[in-house]
C-alpha cells in the first residue's frame, strides 16, 4: 500500500506565442507518493469544463501528466523527444504534439519542484513555447 503525504501545490504555466505571453497559475492541495521507485503527485484542478483529476508521474528524464474527468489526456514529456497526445473533451478532441526541450526536477516528501520547457503544436496551429513549473510543500493540508 502506498503512503500518501498531503501537499500544497502551485502550478504555473507560461505560454509564449509571437511575442505575447500568457500566464496560467493556480494553487491546490493534493498528495505526494512513491510507487515502484517513481514519484507521483496527485491533485484536482478546476477547469472551464469542470473538475479534472491530475496525476503527475516523474521518472528519470520523463514526466507523464495524466488527466481525467472533464478533460482526458495523457501527456508525456521526454527530454529531447517529440510525443503526441489526444486532449479529449465532451465535445471533441484535439491532437497535441509536444517537443520537450528540458525537464528539471528536485523532489522529496517535504517539498519539490518540477520544471518542463516544451514546444507545443495544437492540431495544425502554430507552435507555442510552454514553461510549466509545479512546486509543492508537504504536510500543509488542514
UniProtKB/Swiss-Prot annotation:
Pfam families: DUF1934. This is Uncharacterized beta-barrel protein YwiB. It comes from Bacillus subtilis (strain 168). It comes from the Bacteria. SUPFAM superfamilies: Lipocalins. The gene is ywiB. Forms a beta-barrel structure that may accommodate hydrophobic ligands. Signal peptide: none annotated. Homodimer.
